From Swiss-Prot, chain B:
Keyword annotations of the record: Cytoplasm, Initiation factor, Protein biosynthesis, Repeat, WD repeat
Subcellular compartments: Cytoplasm
GO molecular function, one term: RNA binding
Family matches, as SMART domains: WD40
WD repeats: 8-49, 50-91, 145-184, 189-228, 286-325
Major location category of this protein: cytoplasm
Descriptive protein name: Eukaryotic translation initiation factor 3 subunit I
GO biological process: cytoplasmic translational initiation; formation of cytoplasmic translation initiation complex
Organism encoding this protein: Neurospora crassa (strain ATCC 24698 / 74-OR23-1A / CBS 708.71 / DSM 1257 / FGSC 987)
Family recorded in the similarity comment: Belongs to the eIF-3 subunit I family.
GO cellular component: eukaryotic 43S preinitiation complex; eukaryotic 48S preinitiation complex; eukaryotic translation initiation factor 3 complex, eIF3e; eukaryotic translation initiation factor 3 complex, eIF3m; nuclear periphery
Length: 384, 346
């Protein structure tokens, strides 16, 4: 048997910038080295607790649960609706560059720490200290000790009192922030139909059936007998489909064509050969789980996309990427090319990760000479 | 659940292990140090220094007094857990890839690597579970693996058998007393090495993980495959949870293959399967690299995973985890409850 205590912290913090009366309230920070979950494990608190209970420090199995609790930056009444939550004590202070010019020698006098016992049994501790920037930091903590008993294996309890050794020998009680931190909350709910939820592609019966169907079929062009769909044939415009010579192959090829079209479209929808717009292709089919082009970019893309015109026919996507990469991270380069000849059509779209980079690039690259032509760069208009 | 991140290592984790009470977690990595952590809040208790090479393996005796570690500096070392003091060093011709204490802690086995003309061996050392006792230099037993080297090994119940997993995907059973080979059964796909072997709490069956993307539950007595858990990625580790009938698998693309695979993510997730129904019930993400090792808390309250990214993550389960039951399990539970009430009223 041993006793443990849960604490309540209410923290108010005021930074006094040297030679100014401005009180700065730092923005609340979540995670990082100021992770609030450590408040109940901060060295002073822990020591206090051990001395009070003299058995072991903390047996709360989920010590970090409380780190989602909001940061309170004003002194508040200590009555708490949730007596077991632990409010944070972000003791460390973020360095603010705005304070740099005010860095001067300050008096190191600090007011003595105060300890007030409140009527409701909680304790208020006000402490002052200097942070790394020489600023005075006032930390107000409201603490209430709630003792709850928990049965712990005596061997485990004994081990909790062991002194630290090795690289941890200088660490105080409680987790050291340089080795232990708290990750983002993970929602893990076991579910027996987990696989169905995740839409596993290999288990999709439609896709599997289509794959089986196409396994021993070969794609054959009706125009040139090449290994591509007739619609993709480079000689589509210049040659007529092979007549008598290809007639025998025709039947098999067209069947393959149709099957292929169906696999591209709604697989197994039953409407063979009917046109499926690209946006709907893959619905329920093999590509359902895959990414769709443009879907990743969406609206955001239009804001940081440049249209580049008067591009040389010889231009390559990589060249454009290299040119525009100088201004920031380029997420996408699209250079329109003629399908038959492979030459550039003379315009391109460049998407930046950041709009400000796009603005810079637009200003700099408009009128830039590239391969004997003068580029025209403007923001892309929203697609109709 | 909010995982606790332990960043005590600078290189990839190789093994993590809970002690029997589940309050301490030991971790070893390729950066030559051993860390011990309090499992409930992630506080580091200490580190053990002395190894001169990557540490491949670690084990803790059942009373949590002595720690054994095996390293690429060709040694097995014993440590006093409480203080970090080095107690004993055994030298071997090659690296030590796995150590494990027997159920009572009186014996320690070590698996040595096949290299430089030396065959892979399994050595057994007698251990005195006392930090002040003089440990014997002599090896109690040496088993030479002539066909395929052993990658992992462990002691069955009552130290009756030594079970070894091999590089060629087979599992062997040796007599625990004299080291005779009793069985060698191809369990996993040929030439897909077995990467991990962890025991159930009573050591009557164990789980293996293999690069052939499956994990299997096998009995210790006759090496019968009870269950198979298929995954879609090479597995590095597998463990059996207490309290709930689950198994946890860890794996992911090998670090060297990550850049060459097209997968949007490298599948660096811990996978939970139901131990009996063999179906996957969920995944936990978080690591940036493949999971090299997973370990389940013997009290069933948490599990930890160590990754190629150098982090150990301890996860304390939420209520939803403990409440989860299959329909048949729930029915059975209800029936049992009813019976109990009837006996009480009668």
């Amino acid at each position: 048997m041993c006793e443990t205590a849960a604490l309540i912290f209410r923290v108010s913090k005021t930074i006094f910038a040297p030679h100014s009366n401005i009180q700065k309230f730092p923005p609340p920070k979540n995670g990082g080295e100021n992770c609030p979950g450590f408040s109940n494990l901060s060295p002073t608190k822990n020591r206090r607790q051990t001395s009070a209970t003299s058995t072991h420090r903390d047996d709360n199995p989920r010590p970090f649960q409380s780190s989602t609790a909001p940061i309170t930056r004003r002194a508040e009444p200590a009555e708490s609706k949730q007596p077991h939550t632990v409010k944070m004590a972000a003791v460390q202070q973020k360095h603010d560059w705005a304070d740099d010019d005010e860095l001067e020698e300050t008096s190191t006098e600090l007011p003595p720490p105060q300890k007030i016992t409140n009527k409701d049994g909680s304790t208020t501790i006000i402490e002052y200290r200097l942070n790394d920037n020489g600023q005075k930091v006032k930390t107000t903590r409201r603490i209430r000790y709630i003792t709850h008993r928990e049965v712990v294996n005596p061997r485990v309890a004994e081990r909790k009192s062991w002194t630290k050794f090795g690289l941890s020998v200088k660490d105080g009680a409680g987790p050291a922030p340089d080795t232990t931190s708290v990750g983002e909350n993970i929602i893990f709910k076991p579910s027996f139909n987990w696989r169905q939820d995740a839409k596993d592609e290999s288990k999709d019966p439609n896709a599997q059936a289509m794959k089986d169907k196409l396994k021993d079929k070969k794609v054959k062009c009706r125009i040139c007998n090449g290994e591509h769909f007739t619609a993709r044939c480079p000689y589509k415009d210049t040659m007529a489909p092979i007549g008598e010579a290809g007639a025998a192959a025709d039947v098999a090829a067209s069947a393959a064509d149709e099957a292929a079209a169906a696999s591209q479209g709604a697989a197994g929808a039953g409407k063979k050969g009917s046109y499926v717009p690209p946006a709907l292709r893959g619905a329920g089919g093999a590509a359902a789980a895959g990414e769709r082009m443009g879907g990743k970019y969406g609206e955001r893309d239009d804001l940081a996309t440049l249209r580049v015109t008067n591009v040389s026919e010889m231009a390559e996507e990589q060249e454009l990427r290299d040119m525009f990469e100088r201004f920031g991270r380029v997420t996408r380069v699209f250079l329109a090319k003629d399908r038959d000849t492979g030459l550039a059509k003379g315009f391109a779209f460049i998407s930046f990760a950041d709009r400000s980079d796009a603005v810079k690039a637009c200003a700099k690259m408009d009128g830039f000479g590239f391969r004997h032509l003068i580029l025209r760069v403007e923001f892309a208009k929203k697609a109709a | 659940m909010r995982p606790i991140l332990l960043s005590g290592h600078e290189r990839a984790l190789t093994q993590i292990k809970y002690n029997r009470d589940g309050d301490l977690l030991f971790s070893v990595s390729k950066d030559q140090q051993i860390c011990v952590w309090f499992a409930h809040n992630g506080e580091r208790l200490g580190t053990y220094h002395g190894h001169q090479g990557a540490i491949w393996t670690i084990d803790v005796d059942p009373t949590s007094t002595i720690l054994a570690s095996g390293s690429a500096d060709n040694t097995i070392r014993l440590w006093e857990i409480k203080t970090g003091r080095l107690l004993k060093t055994w030298d071997f011709p090659t690296a030590v890839k796995r150590v494990e204490f027997s159920e009572d802690g009186s014996k320690l086995l070590g698996v040595t690597e096949k290299r430089m003309g030396h065959l892979g061996t399994i050595v057994v050392l007698d251990i005195k579970l006392d930090v002040d006792a003089e440990q014997s230099d002599e090896k109690a037993m040496t088993i030479v693996c002539e066909d395929s080297k052993a990658t992992v090994a462990g002691w069955s119940y009552l130290s009756k058998y030594i079970i070894a997993g091999h590089e060629d995907g087979s599992v062997s059973q040796f007599d625990g007393k004299n080291g005779d080979l009793l069985y060698n059964i191809p369990i996993h796909e040929l030439n897909q090495p077995i990467t991990d072997l962890q025991w159930s709490h009573d050591r009557t069956y164990f789980i293996t993980a293999s690069k052939d993307k499956t994990s299997k539950l096998i009995t210790a007595k006759d090496l019968e495959v009870l269950k198979t858990y298929p995954a879609d990625t090479p597995l590095n580790s597998a463990t059996i949870t207490r309290k709930k009938d689950f198994v946890i698998l860890g794996g992911g693309q090998a670090a060297m293959d990550v850049t060459t695979t097209s997968a949007r993510q490298g599948k660096f997730e811990a996978r939970f399967y139901h131990k009996i129904f063999e179906s996957e019930i969920g995944r936990v993400r978080g690591h940036f690299g493949p999971l090299n090792t997973v370990a389940a808390d013997p009290t069933g309250k948490s599990y930890a995973s160590g990754g190629e990214d150098g982090y150990v993550r301890i996860h304390h389960f939420d209520k939803g985890y403990f409440d989860f039951m299959y329909e048949v399990e729930r029915e059975r539970q209800n029936k049992l409850n009813q019976q109990q009430q009837q006996t009480i009223s009668a």
